[in-house]
Amino acid sequence: MFDVVISDIEAREILDSRGYPTLCVKVITNTGTFGEACVPSGASTGIKEALELRDKDPKRYQGKGVLQAISNVEKVLVPALQGFSVFDQITADAIMIDADGTPNKEKLGANAILGVSLALAKAAANTLQRPLYRYLGGSFSHVLPCPMMNLINGGMHATNGLQFQEFMIRPISAPSLKEAVRMGAEVFNALKKILQNRQLATGVGDEGGFAPNLASNAEALDLLLTAIETAGFTPREDISLALDCAASSFYNTQDKTYDGKSYADQVGILAELCEHYPIDSIEDGLAEEDFEGWKLLSETLGDRVQLVGDDLFVTNSALIAEGIAQGLANAVLIKPNQIGTLTETAEAIRLATIQGYATILSHRSGETEDTTIADLAVAFNTGQIKTGSLSRSERIAKYNRLMAIEEEMGPEALFQDSNPFSKA
């Protein structure tokens, strides 16, 4: 094949699932093939995440427009990348990082850079007429991830007063991805009927989970257990529970407390919940700045529960290495838009995996119809994925893509949960 190079890059403003603008980027090659990617956006963000560039023009979208990011693609990244091989992802990402020249991509915007980075990989895959997961992962990528399904939303993803942000189920006894989705959908619909019978709200939050007004985190967990059993499954054996506390959102940085409680109290609360409920994964149980709290949590629960760092690590290899050295957490949430390029995302996964940390590919609360993360989870054999509830099309699109990949692979597909603390 003759050289296939980048001939043009187009960027446009679209809307995400919250009705706010984001970027859709198309990389076009000299052969006419192209790849297109849409960039997600988070509500609960880590302070060390790469910068999502917004226009801050109050006359457009309450200041959340992305016209400047689009301009940076067209005026900076297009001339920097035109003529480069569509297959040289590492070089292209390095060029964009250098063009930005800041530690957190604040000059050009991580949203601009990531859109180009992901679209480039898709253009290369399409040029070779290969699915993205196969192009990136090669013939050894055949693991379908166990999903973490967010059935009850709280925290910054809803307005219902629940302290924790996500109450999830994990279909750990499923023999396949398709069956895992079925199990999740049946529990989701059972939960809806339970809420209706109790005259609780069945409106959904940002990630498609229900957002009823509940008195406590324990009440949300009790509802999940009831829904699991109503759907005909056994808690712990068939389906386990997972939490995303998003503890930074209720952490007071001045007096270093969690709604007035010490980090030891917070660890105690989580330990007690794990005693009473079949919880095998807790994300961001402590605030990203609370290293002492994270250390205590890791010492207390790290030998029996998956402790996931999201805000703690923000998909940044340097922060992951630092956390590993301090013995913090035992798993890493992977969000490409936290770091801004596909190359850096892959490096974060590689580093965590080498050190024995589990990895979970994740969506953001502000999503689009783009299904790239489904392919990335398979390409990098993460074994776990977070992509929301069993409602809202931007969430369902990822599940449908995973099921399509599984069917395409046939007997080669392996559904495998990478959480070492799974009870199944």
From Swiss-Prot:
**Keyword Magnesium, does the record have it?**
yes
**Cofactor remark from the record:** Binds a second Mg(2+) ion via substrate during catalysis.
GO CC entries: cell surface; extracellular region; phosphopyruvate hydratase complex
User: Where, if anywhere, are coiled coils annotated?
Assistant: none
- Active site per database record: 207, 335
Any Pfam family from its record, for instance, is Enolase_C
HAMAP family the record matches = Enolase (MF_00318)
- Which cofactors must be present for this protein to function? Mg(2+)
Under what name is this protein listed?
Enolase
NCBIfam families attached to this UniProt entry = eno
In terms of PANTHER family, this protein maps to: ENOLASE
Where in or outside the cell it occurs: the entry states: Cytoplasm; Secreted; Cell surface
List the InterPro entries hit by this protein, alphabetically: Enolase (IPR000941), Enolase-like_C_sf (IPR036849), Enolase-like_N (IPR029017), Enolase_C (IPR020810), Enolase_CS (IPR020809), Enolase_N (IPR020811)
Q: Which family does it belong to?
A: Belongs to the enolase family.
